[in-house]
Amino acid sequence: MKVTCVLTLAVLILTIGQIANADSTLGQRYCKASGSWCGIHKHRECCSGNCFFWCVYNGK
């Protein structure tokens, strides 16, 4: 039973990781929430943490 739980948890973590990285392209990531790319403009690093919050907070 413990093995099944561990395996299920591992698959869940890997799946979440794949979804999180789905929009990455050559180190650049598109943030759907903020509608901008990060990794191109140094002042628009909006994808670390909550990208929408940081874009709004930084006034970008």
From Swiss-Prot:
Please list the disulfide bridges. Answer: C31-C47, C38-C51, C46-C55
Q: Which GO terms describe its cellular component?
A: extracellular region
Q: Which UniProt keywords apply?
A: Disulfide bond, Knottin, Neurotoxin, Secreted, Signal, Toxin
Q: Which domain of life does the UniProt lineage start with? A: Eukaryota
- Chief location category: secreted
- Tissue localization of expression: Expressed by the venom duct.
Tell me the compartments it is located in. Secreted
Give the comment on domains.
The cysteine framework is VI/VII (C-C-CC-C-C).
Task: Write the protein's name.
Answer: Conotoxin Cal6.30
